[in-house]
């Protein structure tokens, strides 16, 4: 994703992620009961409290802790917004520990909006600046700028929180603190949606399907949230239909052409990302908005994933209709053009989204456009509408589910034993490549696992925004910009009602497995010591020893299971002992809060010795 760009695979339950189950899973859907640590790995990359981001400004999301070969130690508007949308959905569903992170993010974005950059100032195009330094100063070197998807995605993330505030009777906070930041982004989108910008991979300066589709969603949500706040957004109202109209131009008849130029086919996982990030659980299989279950989106899924079948060595021998490793686009040459974890998870997520929609509307319609997709995974399929009461409905769902699970298994197969996600994995042997601990990757894993368990975000209003206007014209509209100054957040913004009540009392104890990747010598042992009594209160003589019984040549992993009180925050470090010598790992201290989530009986914290 950056002239470059911006996964692992373990299991996380909906409660641990914190989303709300809005559609009851089938009886054979097994929900996981252990927080696998992915959410914590994501939070570790957010300043100021994240263990990988302790030297960043509060609320800033770093793309990766990597500072060289390549350097991703910056904050990107797009990536940050996608990560915060994931966090905000989790918070809205009951994970209240995430609220401070959301507040710090919104405050940081209010400050960043005011920076003068090479893209401009607040009202002169500056919101299209793609990335910033972690001290909230501009990045003034050459880059692919402007990028117009960031403001749209940020507006969507902030609107999700504003919606929660309204639902919990905090109207004044939504209107006075969140709305001014959102309003600036909406003004940028309405003014610039019809202008050329760099795509999400920061390589092609052309119209982009991903950018247009997320801009359309943001404008629609802008209309709705403005009304809820007794505000108006006439520039949203005039431009949303036109953006939808333009969105249709990316459809070729068989697939989405994601962008133009540089001799590409236009097949790009960005189109699948566009569908999943505009998925509406209340929507139907609408072609105009490329909903995940639409004929267009399914045909495109086949076209995009098929484009990687023959070009990656690790996909060799995999039959048509079976899941494969997925990259960005087949002509990719960055790091030699490899599969990406987030791309492979996106291919799975669209299928889970589609199954949710089919179950919700109670039917599956197979058309000439979508037939090739269905035929690959269920050769007996016939065109027509298959009602949920029919055997064919169940057969198709089973086939799609198996296909989706296949993509999860592909990503798992090439994930290291630590579960820590890099950006890419080798097209030849599956070895993780490029930067480690990619924040967007962790977010993509959390969302695909949520969808896998029929856990979905709130509707964005697609049902009332899918009709193409009778007259389509290239246009733009200027909206107001204003300085959004956030000096403080009111205390005690607690939920007035839990959206998904816990059927039992919240746990007071949680068994936490600390997993450490550390290369050691014979006779050397590793210990855990920290600020709470259970970890020795920083006394090395009371440090907790780690086990090495799963340490192997290809996985230098130590671990220990410790029962800890829930909701307790503490600091800790790992130490090595050999004879009478004690070696501490480098500063700073690590930080962790023991999860206290409905239904979660265990958690995993993943670390690497430093």
From Swiss-Prot:
It is found in: Secreted. The active site is at residues 199, 202. Substrate binds at residue 143. Residues 504-610 form the CBM20 domain. It comes from the Eukaryota. Disulfide bonds join 233-236, 245-472, 285-293. Its EC number is 3.2.1.3. One of its GO terms (biological process) is polysaccharide catabolic process. GO terms for molecular function: glucan 1,4-alpha-glucosidase activity; starch binding. Belongs to the glycosyl hydrolase 15 family. This is Glucoamylase ARB_02327-1. It comes from Arthroderma benhamiae (strain ATCC MYA-4681 / CBS 112371).
């Amino acid at each position: 994703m950056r002239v470059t760009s911006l996964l692992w695979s373990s299991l996380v339950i909906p409660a641990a992620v914190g989303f709300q189950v809005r559609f009851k899973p089938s009886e054979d859907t097994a929900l996981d009961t252990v927080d696998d640590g992915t959410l914590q790995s994501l939070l570790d990359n957010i300043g100021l409290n994240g263990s990988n981001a302790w030297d960043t400004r509060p609320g800033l999301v770093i793309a990766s802790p990597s500072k060289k070969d390549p350097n991703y130690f910056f904050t990107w508007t797009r990536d940050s917004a996608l990560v915060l949308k994931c966090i905000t959905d989790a918070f809205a569903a009951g994970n209240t520990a995430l609220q401070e992170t959301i507040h710090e993010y919104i405050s940081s974005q209010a400050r960043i909006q005011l920076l003068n950059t090479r893209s401009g100032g607040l009202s002169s195009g500056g919101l299209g600046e793609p990335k910033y330094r972690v001290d909230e100063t501009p990045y003034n070197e050459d880059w692919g700028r402007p990028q117009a998807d960031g403001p749209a995605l940020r507006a969507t993330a902030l609107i999700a929180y504003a919606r929660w505030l309204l639902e919990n009777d905090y109207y004044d906070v939504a209107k006075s603190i969140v709305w001014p930041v959102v309003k600036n982004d909406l003004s940028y989108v309405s003014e610039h949606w019809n202008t050329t910008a760099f795509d999400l991979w920061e390589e092609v300066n052309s119209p982009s399907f991903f950018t247009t589709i997320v801009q359309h969603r943001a404008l629609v949500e802008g209309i709705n949230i403005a009304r809820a706040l007794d505000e108006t957004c006439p520039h949203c109202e005039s431009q949303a239909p036109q953006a939808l109209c333009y969105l249709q131009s990316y459809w070729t008849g068989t697939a989405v052409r994601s962008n133009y130029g540089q001799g590409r086919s236009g097949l790009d996982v960005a189109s699948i990302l566009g569908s999943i990030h505009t998925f509406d659980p209340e929507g139907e299989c609408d072609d105009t908005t490329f909903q995940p279950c639409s004929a267009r989106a399914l045909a495109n899924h086949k076209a995009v994933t098929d484009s990687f079948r023959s070009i990656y060595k690790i996909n060799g021998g995999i039959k048509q209709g079976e899941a494969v490793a997925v990259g960005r686009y087949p002509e990719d040459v960055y790091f030699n053009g490899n599969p990406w974890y987030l791309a492979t998870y996106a291919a799975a997520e669209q299928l889970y989204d589609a199954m949710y929609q089919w179950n919700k509307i109670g039917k599956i319609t197979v058309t000439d456009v979508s037939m090739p997709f269905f035929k690959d995974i269920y050769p007996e399929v016939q065109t027509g509408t298959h009602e949920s009461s029919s055997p064919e409905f169940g057969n198709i769902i089973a086939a799609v589910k198996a296909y989706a699970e296949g993509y999860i298994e592909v990503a798992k197969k090439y994930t290291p034993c630590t579960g820590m996600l890099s950006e890419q994995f080798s097209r030849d042997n599956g070895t993780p490549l490029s930067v480690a601990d990619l924040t967007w990757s962790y977010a993509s894993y959390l969302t695909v696992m949520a969808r896998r368990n029929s856990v979905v975000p709130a509707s964005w209003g697609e049902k009332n925004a899918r009709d193409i206007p009778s007259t389509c014209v290239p246009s733009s509209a200027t909206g107001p910009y204003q300085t959004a100054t956030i000096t403080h957040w009111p205390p005690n913004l607690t939920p007035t009602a839990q959206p998904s009540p816990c059927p039992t009392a919240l746990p007071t104890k949680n068994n936490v497995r600390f997993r450490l990747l550390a290369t050691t010598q014979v006779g050397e042992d590793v210990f855990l010591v920290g600020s709470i009594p259970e970890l020795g209160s920083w006394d090395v003589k009371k440090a907790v020893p780690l086990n090495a019984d799963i340490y192997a040549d290809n996985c230098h992993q130590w671990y220990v299971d410790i029962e800890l009180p829930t909701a307790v925050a503490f600091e800790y470090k790992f130490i090595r002992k050999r004879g009478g010598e004690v070696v501490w790992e480098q500063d700073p201290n690590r930080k962790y809060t023991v999860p206290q989530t409905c239904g979660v009986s265990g958690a995993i914290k993943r670390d690497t010795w430093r």
